[in-house]
Amino acid sequence: MKDRIVRATAANGGIRLVAVLTTESSLEAKKRHGLSYITTCILGRAFSASLLLASSMKIMHGRVTLRVRSDGPLKGLLVDAGRDGKVRGYVGNPDLELDLVKINNNKYSFDFTKALGTGYLNVIRDSGIGEPFTSTVELVNGNIAEDLASYLYHSEQTPSAVFIGEKIQNKNVICSGGLLAQVLPKKDTDPLLVSLLEERCKEINSFSEDLFHSQDNLLSLIRNIFPDIDDKSISEKARSQEVGFKCKCSKQRSLNAMKMLDKCELEDILKKDGRAELVCEFCKNKYLINYEEIRLMIES
């Protein structure tokens, strides 16, 4: 099943519901960055969170940047996601390994709190019009879902519920994704809607299991919470959209970055190596800038 985002509304348009699957994106990041099991899960969660946030932007070129700065051994992370469904990102310590912790009923989980430590979640929304909007909140516990819910509560004052998780079998991530349920701004003072959202979300006992069983049909995942969604509130074209790991780096962007160096630095590169190799932090693609290209920069 390809990664996908699905949108719906409930309560006569008063509640917005978005579900996203990020399994393939997480595995692509694992391959490109050489991620461990825990860092694959953490980056997958950040992919889900950023795509859920970007899904509400009104223009297709709008983007959301999600950055975690913290004192944990993960050494932070950075994710860039667009309303167009493209997402990319990296973590500070891709090789991180931590022991599993027991949660309940002999079930074990990764210690996301220990991995991220204490710190801040920074969210930048860029609509491409005017200055980007930036907001920062303290990390709640590092599991990404509650950290995102805290951001929505403090920065957007929007009653929201966020569920993000993954399913792991035989040390492989077999599904990753998330779900966002929000009372829309014009309805957020309606106590009945807020209560309805709270009651429905209390019925979710294991989001990761629900995601695993509904990954081929995200609309059924949404219906697990709100069986009575507004079927005709969103057009079929707008309801479902493919998402995936996609980087916007290129050879030209690498050349432009090199041009920012002064001529002395460029001369030094030619003397020492005769060429330059630039590596994209987001996707690990490598771009070779040869002698002639660097010489042209110096002479121009």
UniProtKB/Swiss-Prot annotation:
Disulfide bonds join C247-C249, C280-C283. It is found in: Cytoplasm. Keywords: Chaperone, Cytoplasm, Disulfide bond, Redox-active center, Zinc. Under oxidizing conditions two disulfide bonds are formed involving the reactive cysteines. Under reducing conditions zinc is bound to the reactive cysteines and the protein is inactive. The keyword Disulfide bond applies. One of its GO terms (cellular component) is cytoplasm. It comes from the Bacteria. Belongs to the HSP33 family. Redox regulated molecular chaperone. Protects both thermally unfolding and oxidatively damaged proteins from irreversible aggregation. Plays an important role in the bacterial defense system toward oxidative stress. HAMAP family: HslO. This is 33 kDa chaperonin.
